[in-house]
Amino acid sequence: MNLFQHKHQKLILQCYPAGKAVDKKPNSSELSYLLYYASTRRVKLEKVINFLKDKTHHDVGRNRTGNLQVTLAIIQELIKKCSENLNVFAFQVCYILQSIANTKDLALCKNVVKTFGVLCENLDGGLFTGDKEFIKIFTEVFQTLVSFGKDRSGVTQYDWQMISLMAINDISSCLSYNAAVGKKFIALSIPVLLQFIIANNPQSSILQRLKSNLHVEDDGKRLSRAHSQKSHSKIAQQIDDDFTNDSLTLTDITEKAFSSMKSFFNTNAASQISEVTRAVVQHNILNGTDLEWGVSFLELCITWIPVQLRFVSLSTLLATLGRINIEGNTKSNYNMQFQYARYLLGLLSSRVNMIGLSVSDIIQQLLSLQADLILKASDLDKSEISILTDIYSDCICSLTTHIYYFDQVPDSIQEILIKIDYILESSFVEDNNITSTGEQIQDLIIQLLDNISKIFLILKNKSSSINRNHVNLEHWDISLGLLAPQGDHDDNRKMIISTPQLINIQAKYLKVFDEFLNNELAVGNSKKSYDLLSKQSRLDPGSTAVEGVNKSDDSDNGKDFKKPDANQYITNQQNFISHFLMYIDKFFENYDSPNTQSVLLLVTVLKDMMNILGLNFLSNFIPFFHHWVMKVNRASNFTQRQKFKDTFAHIILYYMLKDLDEQYSHDLQNYCKSSKLFKQILDAVEYRKMQKFWVYGIDPSPSDLENIKGDRTIPTDANGNYIAIRIKPENIEEFACGNNFLIVWLHPQKQLLTEIEKSQVSTHMSTFNNDSRNTNMTVIMDQGSSALSGGADHGGHFVPPPEFVNHTGLSSESASSNSEKGLYTGLGLGTAGDITMIHSEILQYSQHFQERGLPHGNGFATILRTVDSVNSTNDGLIYTYDSKYLQSPRVSDLKDAMSTHRGIRLSKPNFGGANGTANMTDSASTSNGSVLNKNMQTTDVDSILSGLESEDEAAFVV
């Protein structure tokens, strides 16, 4: 022994037992003192590690295995004791490990990998950011250990493989320190892990593990997490014991491979998750791994990722597909795109939940991939394009139907419809800027519509315990342009879609929309007749049951769209029903002779809308009926377009009246089919058949109207000529006035909607609230007095109570209390005598209704007043208790309004100011629904007269 050894050398050498045994262990007391010595000062630590490095080199050269085992044990303890100064001696540790690993002695290499594990546990990011020499030697050590498991055979095969797997498992904790180095470690590790897993695990084994991770057992019982964690701990302990005792099995290797793979995915580093996902998929593709196996395995890997970061893997696949798409869809990258798309579909269609997933963003990217496949030039075959397109379609459907939040389905459908609208807009191009063909546009729009169809079909057949919001009619507003795209574009651009292609698009659109009506909108209560309890509660002003009934409409059973004014489909004329009918009118205007099959589909769709919407549909349809019906009493020659519209209008009105009795059986009691209007429809149809005005083949089979035998008697004039039969506005008005239920909700004088207010187009359905109406009218009642009652006080005629009156602000709602049968006759301009009589009635009845309230009016509300309170007045009220301030409209005012396209403003005092004082100079506009506010369509007298229905009206205008 050298008498002049330094103290640190003596302390180190004292730790080595004497002898040449191969399984030496350091002397414990001497090791403790050495650790204390090394930890006291940094310079001492440097001396210790440098001496150990030199001794290792000496012992390796002389094959002193026992001493090397002691050195590894000392290194492990030094790392643990001096971890805060690990950067001082980490390089030397790696050098020692590399030197010993190069001996390829199994016992030594087992201890090397354990020491490597301790080193990885105590490393931090500092060494990976600034010490290039350390990174180099650390990587060499890792590569050496990983290489031990490759192409091994014999009795020690499992031991060498376990060394590789343990090194890979240990390196997983160092991946996030340096992006470039971590990427290299992943590239070295993933192929080795997959090699072990693929060789020893068929797809059935992968699926079983996946099912276990999803906590779904064959018997339906959930797997206990505590039990699962305990099982994993026991497995890990068993592997360590077998590794120490040289008794490893294939099961140990398999479990360690899965455990190591899990350590790569089970991280909070998004970049690591992305890189590992890409490495797994890329390896499977390049090595020809069975696609179904690979998809199942990736699903298993996703279950190991923290749930809030699982979307990162999905986004990685989508980003890769995006890069491929930018490079161009060619045969050279078709297989890569196909496989990535299948992996993406596997994740989206699995039962793996992903929190934080941006559904709308992903759908937008998928739609872009679909669009580029069809629109962009490529050398792919049509079959290859079809395969990829179908995969993306399945991805969209799977994502949409895996419910994460209430509005997911509506949001997804809306994204698709917005894409369709954008594609349709792009079909209008300048002559020198054509990039796509009409056939490509057609194929893409039909594909996007098919996506929607698949979604509704899946939702119909898929039961879910998660409540969701349903797609509503208003979501489809943006898609109505498909019915008449030419009408929305009046610039110089031309549409590259041909007429046959447009007909194909429209046919697909109508079929998909009809599927929506029957599978998505018509759920629960909407399939049933109008709720009788709701009706009875509304007729009883003192009932409190109506609130509960209304709330039930929003339950899981679906909303009752047959309820009058559901979603304000009657009070608000700017609604989807009117918009849809307006675009149908544009549809007819675009064709001289519309396609029979397209019109047949339109009839089918509207019949389904009738069944769902009931009276709400009829109220919006009436203005369009008058617009479409031919004036057979004034002409005998009509275009084919006019015949189509006329036939279409009669078919819809016929089925509407036929269905109303069943939908509102308690209220109507078979009134519709026994009404004069119903008979007039049949006569009008028969007349058109006899005059060859009727268009056959647009009523779905079996057709009631076309199967009716021609045995009806059509009236003739004195010369024996058939009298032209045309249903006029007064016929429908008479029909509405004949039933107490219809009079409240049906508005025969509703104006024809000719323009859509863009601000009214909303993608979200309003709540069912029939109280969200105009309340310009106030009824002043003494405190403690009872509510208005119909019956005796009103001559025995039905007068709906305030809770039941539908306040629309429409002209048809204003009525004369003296009108025939006690019912309103609608608000027209009338003659000069009519205006004078109205003014007289106002003065006569104003005092009469002061205390008793008003039977009709625009916007009922109730204001209680005490005995000492000051009377408050209405805002724009036609009935007034301060009649001295009322200024009667003059005929000259009306004529002036018509000629200048302005509405009349009636001066009235303002009693509702902030200071309570009246302002005699204030004026109030006429009500929104007043004809005085309507702009005249034309100032040509002849055209005005031709549109009037009676001689009285014509005489008044003249």
From Swiss-Prot:
Region entry Disordered, spans: 540-564
Source superkingdom: Eukaryota
GO cellular component, one term: plasma membrane
Amino acid composition bias (Basic and acidic residues), ranges on this chain: 550-564
Signal peptide per UniProt: none
Example GO biological process: protein localization to plasma membrane
InterPro entries: ARM-type_fold (IPR016024), EFR3 (IPR039786), EFR3_HEAT-like_rpt (IPR049150)
Pfam families: EFR3 (PF21072)
Family: Belongs to the EFR3 family.
Name of the protein in question: Protein EFR3
Native source organism of the sequence: Candida albicans (strain SC5314 / ATCC MYA-2876)
Gene symbol of the encoding locus: EFR3
